[in-house]
Swiss-Prot record:
Gene this protein is translated from: rapA
GO terms under biological process: regulation of DNA-templated transcription
Subunit description: Interacts with the RNAP. Has a higher affinity for the core RNAP than for the holoenzyme. Its ATPase activity is stimulated by binding to RNAP.
The keyword Hydrolase is assigned to this record: yes
Pfam families tied to this protein: Helicase_C, RapA_C, SNF2-rel_dom, Tudor_1_RapA, Tudor_RapA
EC number: 3.6.4.-
Protein name: RNA polymerase-associated protein RapA
Superkingdom of origin organism: Bacteria
């Protein structure tokens, strides 16, 4: 009831015990506000069902004041709803301690309270709790945490960038990989790892409006991140005073935000830890003028600690535009365009020297002199060793140069030339006659590029006169699909109406099973369509996608792509091919392009193929060429002299070749080496694949499902269907769907079946289930019969699980150093600890369940003996706890000191290292060591064993 809560009272959260002791701040209507001073968190609960337990101590309990002194309670007084404790301090002096002054770090022995209250859990739950602790501990210490759970093939350069960036405090970097190398995945990995580690809690993602859906799909499908998509309608309809404050991850279209000052004010007021901006190269900047979009992002970058900019490659942008992105990251470091140009020229000969070392294995006198001039006297010994053929010295030399690279810590840029694993492409053009029905269509935007849309727009026609009855591209498509029978074919067209009509055409005219995929469908409907296409045995041969509908999707299990029409921009063309042409594609991409002869379609095909070479290769110059030649291109597409057209194509080809030559000579191999990770990323790939092959997760999840009443049944090979049973223990179990869900632990299966949940240790279902076990009391008491002939019947053993717990903000990541692994002791009647001689699994195999009533009866009869032994258990385990805490402090200090030394040394030769980064690391070291000093032992679980 509402009146039981008073400001100043101390309560503990039933679901988030790690927050420490809570203080009631306010009771407002139906809401209760609680502050947790230990972590700085504030929570609001419904008054009717707040998951809180009142903190009351009894005479005999020892409690701690927030200044550190202890009080043994003699008497408890209730004054206006607030507890006041009277007793003796450590010097046996009488003291009074109001509950408002209790230490925020006090722990509770809830397991013993439940045991003596008769709340005894099933035996299997105790094992589940122990295993949950062990798995949680292992994952928190893993170098793969936040990297291995992505629904994607692990790729070395992506993992290297993600770890390098996500492990920084408030990273401020530019991701400028070439198209097809997965910048969005890199950004998602950084976001995911920062969220899991606690380095970031609130993330703002700014994207162009046409990419909102792609980001929504990518973040949800690949990382299970629930992103809130904001637009004008959602913002206006929200009842909240600031709609952005309710979203941990917000996805916002930059176009809307620039035009809505009220939304801008709310966005700034909401507070964010990490800003991610996609397509950052579209932010226009000149020395004397900036665009509204650039100005807005600049303001946000000044108040948000972490900034991630995704952009085209620096070579595509030009140096001035590249400088504009770097200004957003660090305006103090990049403040003068002329100085930046000079610095870039300074690094060019060094990069060329490194290229020579990599290609030739040795340095010419000129390259030797260049590097010596760059490194100074300290480089002499290294260069001498390189000259003697020392390969380790070569690697060290390259590392030294990387550390000194002007933008090496803020810019990551991988190229297809430097990354292996891309497929080849083959082009199959099909010129077809233009039907009479398309000759005199009304003019419209690109009407002759998409004549079927213009034809349909004229009005209703009889079924036998629909465009797909006479368009030769449809006849060609049916024949091609029959020729490629049992081969998966992806068909992409510009418009959703065309996609739906093509599905009708295939069904009516051929009976070929097809699935359709367009922006008018919900995400769930698209998932089902994609799954039907992906199914090898019973699925559709063909998936027909609209332009927008296919954004962000990956169909690399197919390698035949039909472009039923051509898009109006080369970036969209590359996006289409990119649905199949990705790292990991095992086959040559077959591009099938039907087009109508003597029409704008034919000329557009020639423009892309002969002018831009955009079919057979990626086209990094496509955007620049389209911009440069656009005024000549558009009129000539619709008509015009053949000679003028041929001249345009020839001019575009010459300009493309010139730009490509510039790109090649301007390649910065030093930067590519740094971005690729030089072997570190490959080690992460191998570790993730090794983790994928282990059975620990499926075995653990079966016990978790069993405990919570989740039924699992086979769906197909490597896949299970999960459904809530009638005996489901907790409705809050994060199943994801009340009706049930299909899961797989197999990465390959998950990549081809997007309708299945891909379960890893990072998945919300796994993490949520583990949290339910550990945050509540599940399995923290048990009584069992032990069958062992070496034990005299009636012998009582007491198994205690303790956890070394530190209450601290997640951003300190103290779980990496002091994870919640179980400290176990097994006490006999004489108080001897047998745990080192009897392993948990060995003991488990000898146990049998005891009826709850009998178990409770035994516990009550032995209460005094058990209570004494429980209190003695803490003394037994205390040395192990102190050792773990000391080791955690040593590890934290060693890691922080090593990183500090590296950054300080690096700052001396590379101004990209910010003072704020070094200061933040120093503070994190100090705060972490101070928090570890307060680590306390918590009794996690008790199991009473009776020999029989």
């Amino acid at each position: 009831m509402a009146q039981q809560y008073q400001p100043g009272q101390r309560w503990i959260s039933d679901s988030e015990a790690e927050l420490g002791l809570g203080t009631i701040l306010a009771q407002d209507g139906r809401l209760l506000t609680v502050l947790y001073p230990a972590t700085g968190d504030t929570r609001q609960y419904s008054l009717r069902n707040a998951p809180l337990t009142r903190v009351r101590f009894s005479p005999g309990d020892q409690i701690t004041h927030f200044e550190g002194w202890k009080l043994t309670v003699r008497e408890v007084e209730d004054i206006d709803g607030l507890m006041v404790y009277h007793g003796l301090d450590g010097q046996n002096q009488p003291r009074t301690l109001p509950e408002t002054q209790l230490s925020n770090f006090i722990q509770f022995r809830l397991a013993s309270d439940r045991l003596f209250a008769g709340q005894i859990d099933p035996l299997s739950w105790f094992s589940l709790r122990y295993n949950t602790l062990q798995h949680t501990s292992k994952q928190m210490q893993s170098a793969l945490w936040g990297l291995g759970g992505c629904r994607a093939q692990p790729i070395a350069h992506q993992l290297h960038i993600a770890r390098e960036v996500a492990d920084r405090s408030a990273p401020r970097v530019l991701l400028a990989d070439e198209v097809g190398l997965g910048k969005t995945i890199e950004a998602g990995l950084v976001i995911h790892r920062q969220l899991l580690s606690g380095r970031a809690s609130r993330v703002l993602i700014l994207v162009p409006e046409n990419l909102q859906h792609q980001w929504l799909v990518e973040m949800r499908r690949r990382f299970n991140l629930q992103v809130a998509l904001f637009d004008a309608e959602r913002f206006i309809e929200s009842d909240a005073s600031n709609p952005f404050e309710d979203a941990q991850l917000a996805l916002v279209a930059l176009e809307w935000l620039v035009d809505d000052e009220k939304a801008q004010d709310a966005l700034f007021a909401a507070g964010w830890d990490l800003l991610v901006v996609d397509e950052a190269h579209h932010l226009v900047w000149h020395e004397d003028q900036v665009s509204a979009e650039y100005g807005l992002v600049e303001q946000l970058a000044q108040v948000i600690p972490g900034v991630l900019l995704l952009t085209a490659t620096p070579e595509q942008l030009g140096q001035d535009s590249h400088f504009a992105r770097l200004r957003l990251l660090d305006p103090n470091r990049f403040h003068d365009l002329a100085a930046f140009r000079a610095e870039s020229e300074h690094y060019r000969p060094v990069a060329e020297a490194v290229q020579e070392l990599l290609d030739e294995g040795r340095l010419s006198p000129k390259a030797h002199a260049t590097i010596l001039g760059f490194l100074g006297a300290e480089g002499e010994a290294l260069l001498a060793a390189v000259s003697d053929g020392d390969t380790q010295a070569s690697a060290r030399l390259i590392r030294e140069l990387l550390d000194r690279h002007g933008t090496g810590r803020v810019l990551f840029r991988n190229t297809r030339a430097a990354i292996q694993g891309f497929p080849e492409r083959q082009l199959h053009p099909y010129p077809l006659p233009t039907p009479e029905q398309y000759r005199d269509l009304p003019a419209g935007e690109h009407a002759e590029l998409y004549p079927e849309v213009a034809f349909q727009a004229q009005g209703e026609v009889a079924d036998d006169e629909r465009w797909w009855r006479f368009d030769p591209r449809v006849d060609w498509l049916i024949d091609t699909l029959k020729m490629l029978k049992r081969t998966k074919v992806l068909v992409i067209c510009a418009h959703a109406e065309t996609a739906m009509d093509l599905e009708d055409a295939l069904r009516v005219r051929s009976g070929i099973p097809a699935s359709v995929f367009h922006e008018g469908m919900s995400i769930l409907e698209r998932d089902r369509a994609a799954a039907y296409f992906a199914d090898e045995e019973f699925g559709a041969q063909v998936l027909i996608c609209s332009e927008i509908g296919s954004e962000g999707r990956n169909f690399q299990f197919a390698h035949h792509l039909v472009m039923f029409d051509l898009p109006a921009h080369p970036d969209l063309l590359e996006q289409r091919i990119g649905r199949l042409d990705r790292i990991g594609q095992k086959h040559t991409i077959q591009l099938h392009i039907p087009y109508l002869q003597d029409s704008p379609q034919e000329r557009l095909f020639q423009w892309y193929h002969e002018g831009l070479n955009a079919f057979l290769n990626t086209c990094p110059t496509g955007n620049a060429l389209q911009h440069q030649f656009g005024p000549r291109l558009l009129p000539l597409l619709e008509g015009g002299e053949n000679k003028a057209w041929d001249t345009l194509v020839a001019d575009a080809r010459s300009e493309r070749e010139r730009l490509e030559a510039e790109l090649h000579t301007g390649r910065d191999r030093l930067l590519e080496l740094n971005s690729g990770g030089a072997g570190e990323g490959q080690a992460l790939v191998e570790a993730i694949l090794e983790q994928d092959d282990q059975f620990a997760l499926p075995i653990y999840m079966e016990t978790l499902f069993d405990a919570f009443g989740i039924d699992s049944e086979d769906h197909s090979e490597n896949a299970l269907i999960l459904k809530p049973s009638e005996k489901m223990l907790d409705a809050s179990f994060p199943l994801g769907d009340d009706e049930g869900v299909t899961i797989t632990y197999d990465r390959g299966q998950a990549l081809s079946r997007e309708d299945m949940q891909f379960l890893t240790w990072e998945h919300p279902m796994v993490q949520g289930g583990m949290d339910l076990v550990l945050s509540g009391s599940m399995g923290n008491t048990a009584v069992a019969l032990i069958k062992n002939k070496a034990l005299k019947p009636g012998t009582v053993l007491l198994e205690l699980l303790f956890v070394s717990e530190v209450v601290a903000p997640r951003s300190l990541q103290l779980g990496r150093y002091l994870p919640p692994a179980a400290l176990r002791c097994l006490l006999d009647a004489n108080g001897n600890d047998l745990a080192s001689r009897v392993a948990f699994e060995t003991l488990n195999d000898q146990l049998e369940s005891v009826p709850r009533a009998s178990a409770n009866k035994f516990v009550q009869a032995q209460r005094d003996v058990l209570a004494k032994r429980i209190s003695g258990g803490e003394e037994k385990i205390l040395p192990a706890h102190n050792e773990r805490v000391a080791e955690a402090q040593r590890r934290l200090a060693a890691e922080a000191d090593e990183e500090l030394a590296r950054l300080v040394a690096l700052q001396a030769v590379n101004p990209s290292v910010r003072d704020s980064e070094i200061d933040a690391l120093r503070k994190r070291r100090e705060d972490g060591l101070a928090m570890l000093e307060k680590a306390a032992l918590r009794l996690e679980a008790i199991r009473v064993l009776v020999a029989g």
